[in-house]
Swiss-Prot record:
Organism ancestry: Eukaryota, Viridiplantae, Streptophyta, Zygnematophyceae, Zygnematophycidae
Name of this protein: ATP-dependent Clp protease proteolytic subunit
Reaction(s) this enzyme catalyzes, per UniProt: Hydrolysis of proteins to small peptides in the presence of ATP and magnesium. alpha-casein is the usual test substrate. In the absence of ATP, only oligopeptides shorter than five residues are hydrolyzed (such as succinyl-Leu-Tyr-|-NHMec, and Leu-Tyr-Leu-|-Tyr-Trp, in which cleavage of the -Tyr-|-Leu- and -Tyr-|-Trp bonds also occurs)
Primary gene name: clpP
Positions of the catalytic residues: S101, H126
EC number(s) per entry: 3.4.21.92
Domain of life according to the entry: Eukaryota
């Protein structure tokens, strides 16, 4: 039997009594965001709304986005990436588990020097895919053109954020390229592996 979303006590400033809120709402108050599912319009809009709210609440405090996602819709992922660049506070990205496809794209969108992978995390990049092959020929051609434009956009972002040459990114996106946390660091998708941060403290 599912237990639902866990609830935790939370006391608002000035209040004597704590109220029970779901754990995600409590963590949002600490500026901790979670992408733990396929990227779709609904989760993208939730994350964007939370980032904009937290940006308005305090522009001086960083946000932290924890990612464990197999990817998802390209435009939804790009919208989350754009919102991360739009808000004033730095957005730290932390990969735990898997950041694949749009998950890795969002991971690389964190503030440079503040992108982290946990030691056993996996990262995967590949090209955007289309799911509309059963339409009219003209529609398929327009769809293919749009997919190529999206691929070009994604490639440019990876080039900018990783420092890798466009030819290498383009070549690697031809297939599913899986990386360990250390390989993702060497590739420039993340800046640190969590064990590295532990060893310096």
């Amino acid at each position: 039997m599912p237990i639902g979303v866990p609830r935790v006590p939370f006391r608002l400033p000035g209040e004597e009594e704590a109220v029970w809120v779901d754990v995600y709402n409590r963590l949002y108050r600490e500026r901790l965001l979670f992408l733990g599912q396929n990227v779709d319009d609904e989760i993208a809009n939730q994350l964007i709304g939370i980032m904009i709210y937290l940006n308005g609440e305090d522009e001086s405090k960083d946000m932290y986005m924890y990612i464990n996602s197999p990817g998802g819709a390209v435009l939804a992922g790009i919208s989350v990436y754009d919102a991360m660049q739009f808000v004033v506070p730095d957005v730290h990205t932390i990969c735990m588990g898997l950041a694949a496809s749009m998950g890795s794209f969002i991971l690389t969108g964190g503030e440079i020097t503040k992108r982290i992978a946990l030691p056993h995390a996996r990262v995967m990049i590949h090209q955007p895919a289309s799911s509309y092959y059963d339409g009219q020929a003209g529609e398929c051609m327009m769809e293919a053109e749009e997919v190529l434009k999206l691929r070009d956009c994604i490639t440019k972002v990876y080039v900018q954020r990783t420092g890798k040459p466009a030819w290498l990114i383009s070549e690697d996106m031809e297939r599913d390229v899986f990386m360990s946390a250390k390989e993702a660091q060497e590739y420039g998708i993340v800046d640190l592996v969590a064990s590295d941060t532990n060893s310096t403290t």
